[in-house]
Amino acid sequence: MATGGGAEEERKRGRPQLLPPARPAARGEEADGGREKMGWAQVVKNLAEKKGEFREPRPPRREEESGGGGGSAGLGGPAGLAAPDLGDFPPAGRGDPKGRRRDPAGEAVDPRKKKGAAEAGRRKKAEAAAAAMATPARPGEAEDAAERPLQDEPAAAAGPGKGRFLVRICFQGDEGACPTRDFVVGALILRSIGMDPSDIYAVIQIPGSREFDVSFRSAEKLALFLRVYEEKREQEDCWENFVVLGRSKSSLKTLFILFRNETVDVEDIVTWLKRHCDVLAVPVKVTDRFGIWTGEYKCEIELRQGEGGVRHLPGAFFLGAERGYSWYKGQPKTCFKCGSRTHMSGSCTQDRCFRCGEEGHLSPYCRKGIVCNLCGKRGHAFAQCPKAVHNSVAAQLTGVAGH
């Protein structure tokens, strides 16, 4: 045959002849591989039985039933032994990216855990973003911004109750004789004090009220008003029956006054008080739990400002020959003779004249004119003082000494 002859010619020429692959040998190798796979499956099953985690073999897939691969038929395993499943193998070793620890409770728990973790993560991110966008403001920042004056306007009074440069002018005369707002602004503030209209932010009077609230544009203007007021209030008659309040909350006091003689007239007490402080209300009698008068008077006052600060009332004083005592919260204890706070009058070595009120000599050796201890003017004593109740026309007509 030509084919056989061609092959012989090739052998004669010394060329190697390519032989077809040996199929029976390949089938034998597959059979050997099948036996190796069967042996590994048996080992896995034995390990699973020892651990108690052996699972029933699942039914074969359709691809396996249809005989899509020849390897399954070539296994030739014993009856009842199925191909190993992935769940039958032990957990993968450390470092295997596909390995994971199986939950004994089943895979049904994992979705809930993952969902809860995702929600917690989103909630933390949202809180962090909100904290970054809305930084908590400094306490009181809104109030400070509201009190800050506008840039295009002159500095005015700030919010109510804070930073207001305010005084209150009160009329203490008869209600029917209360002056108008024009008198307070024109005669008192502008003419007597000498303020400029641009220094004043507002002058407020409630209809029917005897109080005038004066708001200044700065603390300097307020200080100027108070300084001039202390000078003019005793010199000019226009300030009679007027008092200025609201200079300092610490200057408001509840005063108690006591005399050994209960016949001292309350109007004389008010006259003496007006020399040293501003009387906000008429003194009233203090009674005990039985309703009996204790001899004390109580009233609300406002201390005045001096060069060194608040000017306090003396703890002891005289109205005529009657000695009176005063006290209030915060009143310093001073010597009656020299006014020192380091000692009392019992140990004081300073001489003081009770006739003229000056230091350095005693009353029997006084060569100066007498000074009234009620009104503070020189030239007459308390008995002849025109401001004393017993010298008033009303007292002479009625014969009442002021009770």
Curated annotation (Swiss-Prot):
Recorded superkingdom: Eukaryota
Compositional bias segments (type: Gly residues): 67-79
Protein's cellular compartments: Cytoplasm
Pfam families xref list: RBD_ZCCHC3_1st (PF23057), RBD_ZCCHC3_2nd (PF23058), zf-CCHC (PF00098)
Main location class: cytoplasm
Modified residues (Phosphotyrosine): 201
Region: Disordered, residue numbers: 1-158
Zinc fingers (CCHC-type), renumbered ranges: 335-350, 352-368, 372-387
Keyword flag Heme: no
Composition bias type Basic and acidic residues, residue spans: 26-38, 47-65, 95-121
Keywords, alphabetical: Antiviral defense, Cytoplasm, DNA-binding, Immunity, Innate immunity, Metal-binding, Phosphoprotein, Repeat, RNA-binding, Zinc, Zinc-finger
SMART domains listed in its UniProt record: ZnF_C2HC
GO BP term (any one): positive regulation of RIG-I signaling pathway
Bias kind Low complexity: ranges: 128-139
SUPFAM superfamilies listed in its UniProt record: Retrovirus zinc finger-like domains (SSF57756)
An example Gene Ontology molecular-function term: double-stranded DNA binding
InterPro entries xref list: ZCCHC3 (IPR042509), Znf_CCHC (IPR001878), Znf_CCHC_sf (IPR036875)
GO cellular component: cytoplasm
Quaternary state and interactors: Interacts with CGAS. Interacts with RIGI. Interacts with IFIH1/MDA5.
Summary of the function given for this chain in its UniProt record: Nucleic acid-binding protein involved in innate immune response to DNA and RNA viruses. Binds DNA and RNA in the cytoplasm and acts by promoting recognition of viral nucleic acids by virus sensors, such as RIGI, IFIH1/MDA5 and CGAS. Acts as a co-sensor for recognition of double-stranded DNA (dsDNA) by cGAS in the cytoplasm, thereby playing a role in innate immune response to cytosolic dsDNA and DNA virus. Binds dsDNA and probably acts by promoting sensing of dsDNA by CGAS, leading to enhance CGAS oligomerization and activation.
Stated name of the protein: Zinc finger CCHC domain-containing protein 3
Organism whose genome encodes this protein: Homo sapiens
Gene that this sequence comes from: ZCCHC3
